[in-house]
Amino acid sequence: MNKNKKGFKLFFIFPVIAFGLGTWQVYRYDWKKRLIQRAKDRMEEDPIELSNSFIKNFKGSSFGDLNKYEFRRVYLNGKVIDNQYVLLGPRSIDGTLGYYVISPLQLSDGTRILLNRGWSASTPKSNYKIPYAIEELKLIHQKEKEQGQQQGNQESILYRYFNILGVISKTKERGSAFTPTNQPEKGQWYSLDVDAMADQLNTEPLMINTMDETEINSKPSSLPNPQFKRFDNDVESSFHNKHMSYIGTWYTLSASLFFIYFRYMRKLPK
């Protein structure tokens, strides 16, 4: 009997571990709240101009310092290369599958950065692998190509100029345990990796999330600009913050195990 009691005492370690994990999640929750508040504070600051000189200050390895600019609003203008892109997803919004469309943006000095133009729902005819925005862009360029051929211009315009208001993006996101590994060679991007995407599209490792864009064009296209779900001021949606549920889970488990321990310890013979 003494052996049983001694063995059951070892059970005490499990509720202690669960309590420790719950406490660790409390600290994680507090840390995440500070990150979110810092992002909110940055979003409230006046937008800064994302000039060529700003980009040059972060050339090379110093792009690692961009974390202090994450969630700062910026305004810029440049040439969006419509026919070059990566699709990040699929991501579900309001029960609909879609992708974020990320294209190169070329500034006046030729520097290229990444521009996340926003989320677009997938088309059923593509087996939900291509967003509507890509189909719309193809229609726009096909129309421009036909107009150019009528005017004796055999080249299709595959870029357009925009004024853009956006937010400096984080450079990487951690997916869940079930998120597949990115496969750039197959064009499959399941989680954000700005460095790898920059290599794929030959840009600097800097990405802007578009909040608003206005086309600069003296001869507007006869077709409307593709509709994207843009980024807004809802900063919290950019953070994976489930620490409160983890806190509840671990503390509940700890309390249950403590209850089992003390209840059955009293029943064991001395």
From Swiss-Prot:
One of its GO terms (cellular component) is mitochondrial inner membrane. It is a multi-pass membrane protein. Its main location: mitochondrion. PROSITE patterns: SURF1 (PS50895). It is found in: Mitochondrion inner membrane. Keywords: Membrane, Mitochondrion, Mitochondrion inner membrane, Transmembrane, Transmembrane helix. The chain crosses the membrane at residues 7-29, 246-265. CDD domains: SURF1. PANTHER family: SURFEIT LOCUS PROTEIN, SURFEIT LOCUS PROTEIN 1. Belongs to the SURF1 family. Probably involved in the biogenesis of the COX complex. This is SURF1-like protein. It comes from Dictyostelium discoideum (Social amoeba).
